[in-house]
Amino acid sequence: MNDKKNRYILHWIGQLSKIRPELGNFAICPYASKANYTIVDEKLSQIVPNNDFDVIIYVVEDNISAQFLYDAVDDYNRNYPDYKFIADHGKTKTYIKGIQTSNGKYNLVLCQLRNELTEARKKLAKTNYYDYWDKDYLEEVLEDDYKVVEIHIEPELE
């Protein structure tokens, strides 16, 4: 992977880790700065999960559509049920309270153990972390975990 891509992604991780007053003094991703992660340049079709790291950030081809990336990630999630794959398409911008959460440049697939992610989300649900999220975006991001955490957050989202 070229150094420019690596630096950009490291900067994005730094942005995800920043404490944000507009998010109740939470970071976009409160666990990002302490996670044991690696950044890997890989073809989308060649991704193979492993648990050597908390998170593996796969940088995949630039020339694929958002829908193709999301469909591939859905396939990975079905084929590797112990892992959670999350797509971040370079041209798709996502926000929480006006703060960009997506990297905005490269096509990425984040991979981590599903049970660890679910546990982290349960812990966050016991705080006011999710109070700042739009309900539709929250459901989109949490997917199956929405049902797991909604018991803690549903009253605030009404």
Predicted regions and their residues:
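Expand to "…catalyze enediolate/carbanion chemistry for C-C bond making/breaking, isomerization
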Residues: M1-E158
